[in-house]
Every structure is written in C-alpha cells, then in structure tokens.
Regions:
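Alpha-carbonic anhydrase
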Residues: 2-7, 27-270
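Bacterial N-terminal signal peptides
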Residues: 11-22
C-alpha cells in the first residue's frame, strides 16, 4: 500500500513539474481577456525534431529519463483484446476556461469549472479534468491509420492517478467549440491568455463514446511520465480544413513518433 501511494505521489510530482496536469485555480475576476507572458515549466528545453527531438529526450535531463521507459505513448493500435470494460461517463459542464496557452509546443487550455468540477468516471475512479490540448496530425495510429488531428483531454484523481482521453479529429464539418478556442488562442509563442470564454468540453466529444481502446502508457511529451491510463475513442469528430490549417500555421507537426508496445495489452470495449 505504501509503495502504491509513493508511486502515485511520484507520478503527480513529475507531471506537475512539467506543467502537464495543473490542478485548476479559480480565474481572476475580469471584464475582458488579458494576455500575459507564459513561463515555461520545463527547466530543459526540448523539441519534436533535431538535437532536442524525441530520440534525445531521455538524455536531455535526468528528469526526462522516463522518456526511455518501456510503457511510452503514443502507440499504433493494431492487436487488441476484447474486454467487458465499464462505460466511460463524462460529467462535463459549461464553465470558464482558465487559460488558453501557446506554450511553444501546442495550444493548451487549462480548464476550470466552479462547484464540483468536471470529471471522467471509469468504474470506481473519478478523474477531474485539468487541461486539454491538441496535436497535428494525431499522435495515435489506429491499425496504421493516422488522423488529421487529435484532442487530448487530461484528468487526474485526488490520489494523483492520471487518465487521458484521445479524441480523434478528421477533416469535415467545422466544430463550433474548436472554433471558439481558435478565436481566443494566442498567435504568439509564449503567451498566456486569461480567457473570458465559457465552454463545455462535452461539445468536443463524439456522440458515441461507448466504443474505445484502453491501454497503459505515458505523457507524450517530457518528462514522459508513465502510469497514465489512456482511452482512445473509436469515433472521431470533424473539424474543417480551415480549422486544421489555422492550427497548422502555428504547429504544423507537434507529434511524438509511436512507441513500442513492449508486450502491453490494448483492451477494446465489447
């Protein structure tokens, strides 16, 4: 029991150190949106390519050692094991976004909702939504297929357990919620926008969330913390070609290559 608690605290500490799972704070009262400098949480800079790219992450900083681990993400979902998995329950509500951040690697939204907050419920576990961000193209492959983009909704329990929900995005009709975020995202790297926008993250979920893949993996950027439960929804949502292009102007390729499974089992809901 003590080792489990220590491990959970270690996962939480490592994730917090990288700014990937910030527990939301209530936003300041404000009459209009404000832009502030963004202070990077990464002590050692990294990138997706070149001398600081994925192949070198594990050597850039001792804090990034997990990037050389055996349970890394993303993966190519090919062989799966059918399982009677619990339904995913999304207890999402309309609430104010805390920050819309251009952090030099992606557009990330720190989410805050008053009251009980917004939760992903899986079995007996309740994971609170802390932030979401985007990648282009998708980091995940499904049987060799990559999608135009992916949305990662990141959640955490009080004990520090982390769960990510991957929503695959494909070109098609425009998504109103995504457009609202695009209309408020800072165009300049290193900007942190205090948002006056209210949003329900459920508006970025597909109508069908019953079918999904599940596996144990990691954060997909340094420090690559392992112990993350990933849920990859089978049904994609659509975004317009213009919305994809708008993101691509900032981040044309913010993806980590797929990582070896190393014997991990990918479960598929029946």
């Amino acid at each position: 029991m003590r080792s489990n608690i220590r491990y959970a605290l270690w996962v939480r500490a490592a994730a917090l150190a990288a700014g990937m799972f910030l527990v939301p704070q209530a936003p300041r009262a404000q009459s209009a949106e404000q832009v502030h400098p963004y202070v990077s949480p990464w002590k050692t800079p990294w990138d997706y390519e070149g001398a600081r790219g994925n192949d070198h992450w594990g050597d850039l900083d001792p804090a990034y050692a997990a990037c050389k681990g055996k349970e890394q993400s993303p993966i190519d979902i090919r062989r799966t094991q059918k399982a009677a998995l619990p339904a995913l329950r999304f207890e999402y509500h309309t609430g104010p976004l805390q920050y819309v951040i251009n952090n030099g690697h992606t557009i990330r939204v720190n989410y805050y909702a008053p009251g009980s907050g917004d939760f992903l419920v899986f079995g007996d576990e309740r994971y609170q939504l802390t932030q979401f961000h985007f990648h282009r193209p998708s980091e995940e492959y499904v049987r060799g297929k990559r999608y135009d983009m992916v949305l990662h909704l990141m959640h955490e329990t009080r004990e520090g357990k982390v769960a990510g929900v991957a929503v695959l995005l494909k070109a098609g009709a425009a998504n109103r919620a995504v457009q609202e975020i695009w209309d408020h995202m800072p165009a300049t790297e290193g900007q942190n926008l205090v948002s006056a926008l209210d949003l329900n993250p459920a508006s970025m979920l597909p109508d069908d969330t019953a079918d999904y893949y599940m596996y144990m993996g990691s954060v997909t950027a340094p420090p690559c913390t392992e112990g993350v439960t990933w849920f990859v929804l089978k049904t994609p949502i659509t975004v317009s070609a213009e919305q994809i292009s708008a993101f691509a102007k900032l981040y044309p390729h913010d993806v980590r290559p797929v990582q070896p499974l190393n014997g991990r089992i990918v479960k598929e809901s029946k």
